[in-house]
UniProtKB/Swiss-Prot annotation:
Enzyme Commission identifier(s): 1.1.1.267
Sequence positions that bind Mn(2+): D151, E153, E224
One Pfam family linked to the record: DXP_reductoisom
Catalytic activities: 2-C-methyl-D-erythritol 4-phosphate + NADP(+) = 1-deoxy-D-xylulose 5-phosphate + NADPH + H(+)
Keywords linked to the UniProt accession: Isoprene biosynthesis, Manganese, Metal-binding, NADP, Oxidoreductase
Protein's recorded name: 1-deoxy-D-xylulose 5-phosphate reductoisomerase
Top-level class of the enzyme under EC nomenclature: oxidoreductase
Organism: Paraburkholderia phytofirmans (strain DSM 17436 / LMG 22146 / PsJN)
Lineage: Bacteria, Pseudomonadati, Pseudomonadota, Betaproteobacteria, Burkholderiales
UniProt cofactor(s): Mg(2+); Mn(2+)
Length: 401
């Protein structure tokens, strides 16, 4: 039976990769809805190729522009806009599968709507679990939704776990691998000089600018630790991070009998996307087979928290529980945005996040409203902290110890 997809964030890198896989298997997948924020021209191209019933954009002006271009081309796709429109296409009866690929907190509401509607959810938006882990997982369970991880690391773990996962014993720990990003071997004292363009040059993966910066700070890996906690029901002390510069082993599961199962493959997001789209089947992803003879070596090392203080902050937020992870994510989004705008230096990202976590009281999350309030408070606190940084100090902050 053909799956009908809503693709949240279709114009981003995950969206591109998803549509590449979809195009290879028209008998298996069709597109019900595509969504973008402001990249109207690219969305028009996608609509003309995949002919979705609905397309969603961020604002009225972009909607009018996209609608006019589609009418001129004879495309009948309906154009809507705004946050509620994202929620509507995520819970619509027109789709059975939602690919959640919107970056950041903006993806929480539509992802949660898909869970409450009992959809099959391919989760690439890790912030949904980072911000509202218990609330999100309860919605998945209570409404019969199916949650399949698309992040390469979590998809790798999913492939290495028995279907009953860690709840039934036998799993000692899971091991998330990380490339270490572009600054793995750079002298820590020089990281204050890093530019946005340097931070966005990932050695192995092709990603958007925000997630590229998160990879460079290793905040991305920290968020993945939190995500893994919720996905696989494991405490933080049973989730290990290892730097693996080759990005060939995407993650591992260690078992009580001494076995370690690993998932290997070329670093291309189409592999985990194809796995999740077709699960439990396997389909061609378009990714070349891994040639083990060409893999010169596989190396591993422990992450350096002095070089990567954001990873330490994320692990700390998970241990604290409550709304700490939501505050961490919000502060990081504001700090990364400021860094990309050249308002603060690279190492100030961790300083901003640390300051926000120390300034805001932590409390339990009982409802989505609690998460939204914590997110807003952390964003305000981060912006205020950035505004107070002296101009001359913004690029010379020391790392959080």
């Amino acid at each position: 039976m053909q799956k009908r997809l809503t693709l949240l964030g279709s114009t981003g890198s995950i969206g591109d990769s998803t549509l590449d896989v979809v195009a290879r298997h028209p008998e298996r997948f069709s597109v019900y809805a595509l969504t973008a924020h402001r990249n109207g021209d690219k969305l028009v191209e996608q609509c003309l190729r995949f002919q979705p019933e609905v397309a969603v954009v961020g604002d009225a002006d972009t909607a009018a522009s996209v609608a006019a271009k589609l009418r001129e081309a004879g495309c009948k796709t309906e154009i809507t806009y705004g946050p509620q429109a994202l929620v509507d296409v995520s819970k619509s009866d027109g789709c059975d599968t939602v690919v959640a690929a919107i970056v950041g907190a903006a993806g929480l509401a539509p992802s949660l709507a898909a869970a409450r509607a009992g959809k099959r959810i391919l989760l690439a938006n890790k912030e949904a679990l980072v911000m509202s882990g218990a609330i999100f997982m309860d919605a998945v369970r209570d409404n019969g939704a199916v949650l399949l991880p698309v992040d390469s690391e979590h998809n790798a773990i999913f492939q290495c776990l028995p279907r009953e996962a860690a709840l039934h014993g036998g799993v000692s720990k899971i091991i998330l691998t990380a490339s270490g990003g572009p600054f793995r071997t750079r002298e820590p004292a020089t990281l204050v000089e890093v530019t946005p363009d340097e931070a966005c040059k990932h050695p192995n993966w092709v990603m958007g600018r925000k997630i590229s910066v998160d990879s460079a700070t290793m905040m991305n890996k920290g968020l993945e630790v939190i995500e893994a906690h919720w996905l696989f029901n494991l405490p933080g002390e049973r989730i290990e991070v290892l730097i693996h510069p080759q990005s060939v082993i995407h993650s591992m599961v260690s078992y009580a009998d001494g076995s370690v199962l690993a998932q290997l493959g070329n670093p291309d997001m189409r592999t985990p996307i194809a796995h999740a789209l077709a699960f439990p089947d396997r389909v061609d992803s378009g990714v070349a087979q891994l040639d083990l003879l060409q893999v010169a070596s596989l190396s591993f090392e422990k992450p350096d928290y002095t070089r990567f203080p954001c990873l330490a902050l994320a692990v700390k937020a998970l241990a604290e529980g409550g709304l700490a992870s939501a505050a961490l994510n919000a502060a990081n989004e504001i700090a990364v945005e400021a860094f990309l705008a050249r308002q603060i230096g690279f190492m100030a990202i961790a300083q901003v996040v640390d300051a926000v976590l120390n300034a805001l009281p932590n409390r339990s999350a009982h409802a989505l409203e609690d998460v939204i309030e914590a997110d807003a408070a952390a964003r305000r606190a981060a912006a205020e902290f950035i505004a107070r940084l002296p101009d001359g100090a913004r690029r010379t902050e020391r790392a959080v110890q």
